[in-house]
């Protein structure tokens, strides 16, 4: 525990102080620039937000040395970062969102990477605030309230000035064995395909995304995340401790124009993709890789390292000048104030780590798929399924 604290606190000081600087710059631009030009604000925010998010990329790439292996055909790999895309992924690990950031950074669109997330995420210190300024979409997990919020948020992206990725985890929650068991029981009772490696997708958000963005988003990137049997599952705590993991990502590109128009057919298309994803994960379990798929080299750029070194130098210089000016440690009051500040940073880091844990995630309140046989009735309500998955 002491070792973990010794590692987490210095990283936390760097991340949260630099993050507050970034949040302040974002707030100033939001107030002064956005009212005059939304596109100019977005371009500035893209650069500003990336200077913060690259710190987390550095933790994955350089501090923990997590190896992300990407499997995709050349055409798909070469398209990434050159077009707007809806990214649909299974929610396998605690750091799936960071894996997405790594791939976005390699594709040159980290600053315009977006996601649909639960509303509580925007209140996370520094990271959640930066996401809010960057136009992430936050939902309450209540479709009666979220439908209009999602629709308006999606339509606002129509004039986004740079290629963006919008990530959507349609399972609605992170994968655990307990949630899988609940999903299997529900599927069996509803005469749906019984999943083995994924949860049952909640399709309303996906249908809304396709319906509202098909006119300006040309592609859907179907990503499948898997953890090899020889690697421990990656977590935020392992990252901060500098402990490596391996993550496999399979990417398949679908053209948005090839999707059907009716909403029920869009929903069925999504369910079919997760049935195929389940079968693909079966193959991965058997071979401990995605067999027959080409592995692409995504490298490890030094940009994130350069950003972290720059932040560390600036903050160290600033801290030295501040301490020299304030004589903070010359009194018990100053020492107590410093200890209080460290305590706040440690608490914020714990909040960030705990918020990422799959065991603490909750299922989305979105109606499940209907069985293909419309004469069969499913469980009495979605609440019943959610209670089983908790």
UniProtKB/Swiss-Prot annotation:
GO molecular function per UniProt: 1-acylglycerol-3-phosphate O-acyltransferase activity
Sorted UniProt keywords: Acyltransferase, Endoplasmic reticulum, Lipid biosynthesis, Lipid metabolism, Membrane, Phospholipid biosynthesis, Phospholipid metabolism, Transferase, Transmembrane, Transmembrane helix
Broad class of where this protein is predominantly found: endoplasmic reticulum
GO cellular component, one term: endoplasmic reticulum membrane
Cited Pfam families: Acyltransf_C, Acyltransferase
Gene Ontology process terms (BP): CDP-diacylglycerol biosynthetic process
Domain of life: Eukaryota
Locations listed in the record: Endoplasmic reticulum membrane
Motif (HXXXXD motif): 91-96
Residues that span the membrane, as ranges: 2-22, 305-325, 333-353
Catalytic activity: a 1-acyl-sn-glycero-3-phosphate + an acyl-CoA = a 1,2-diacyl-sn-glycero-3-phosphate + CoA
Enzyme class: transferase
Pathway given in the UniProt record: Phospholipid metabolism; CDP-diacylglycerol biosynthesis; CDP-diacylglycerol from sn-glycerol 3-phosphate: step 2/3
Leader sequence residues: none
CDD domains linked to this entry: LPLAT_LCLAT1-like (cd07990)
Membrane topology summary: Multi-pass membrane protein
Segments for region (Disordered): 358-390
E.C. number(s) listed in UniProt: 2.3.1.51
Biological role stated in the UniProt entry: Converts lysophosphatidic acid (LPA) into phosphatidic acid by incorporating acyl moiety at the 2 position.
Family: Belongs to the 1-acyl-sn-glycerol-3-phosphate acyltransferase family.
Entry comment, domain topic: The HXXXXD motif is essential for acyltransferase activity and may constitute the binding site for the phosphate moiety of the glycerol-3-phosphate.
Name recorded for this polypeptide: 1-acyl-sn-glycerol-3-phosphate acyltransferase 2
Gene: LPAT2
């Amino acid at each position: 525990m002491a070792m973990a604290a010794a590692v987490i606190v210095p990283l936390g000081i760097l991340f949260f102080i630099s993050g507050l600087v970034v949040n302040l710059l974002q707030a100033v631009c939001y107030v002064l620039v956005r009212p005059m030009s939304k596109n100019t604000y977005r371009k500035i925010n893209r650069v500003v937000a990336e200077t913060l998010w690259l710190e987390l990329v550095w933790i994955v790439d350089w501090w923990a040395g997590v190896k992300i292996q990407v499997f995709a055909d050349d055409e798909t790999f070469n398209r990434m970062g050159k077009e707007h895309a809806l990214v649909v992924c299974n929610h396998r690990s605690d750091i799936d969102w960071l894996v997405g950031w790594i791939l976005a950074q390699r594709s040159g669109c980290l600053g315009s990477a977006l996601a649909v997330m639960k509303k509580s995420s925007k209140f996370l210190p520094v990271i959640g605030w930066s996401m809010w300024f960057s136009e992430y979409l936050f939902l309450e997990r209540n479709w009666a309230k979220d439908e209009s919020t999602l629709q308006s948020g999606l339509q606002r992206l129509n004039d986004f000035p740079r290629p963006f990725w919008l990530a959507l985890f349609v399972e609605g929650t992170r994968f655990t064995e307990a949630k899988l068991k609940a999903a299997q029981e529900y599927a069996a009772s509803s005469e749906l395909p019984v999943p083995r490696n994924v949860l049952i997708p909640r399709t309303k958000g996906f249908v809304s995304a396709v319906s509202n963005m098909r006119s300006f988003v040309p592609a859907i990137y179907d990503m499948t995340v898997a953890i090899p049997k020889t690697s421990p599952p990656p977590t935020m705590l392992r990252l901060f401790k500098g402990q490596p993991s391996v993550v496999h990502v399979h990417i398949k590109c679908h053209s948005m124009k090839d999707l059907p128009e009716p909403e029920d057919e869009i929903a069925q298309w999504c369910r079919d993709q997760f049935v195929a994803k389940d079968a693909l994960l079966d193959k991965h379990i058997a071979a401990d890789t995605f067999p027959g798929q080409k592995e692409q080299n995504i490298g490890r750029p030094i940009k994130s390292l350069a950003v972290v070194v720059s932040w560390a130098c600036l903050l160290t210089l600033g801290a030295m000048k501040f301490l020299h000016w304030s004589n903070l440690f010359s009194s018990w009051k100053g020492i107590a104030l410093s200890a209080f500040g460290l305590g706040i940073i440690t608490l914020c880091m714990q909040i960030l780590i705990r918020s990422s844990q799959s065991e603490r995630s909750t299922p989305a309140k979105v109606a499940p798929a209907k069985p293909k046989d419309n004469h069969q009735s499913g469980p009495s309500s979605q609440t019943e399924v959610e209670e089983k998955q908790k």
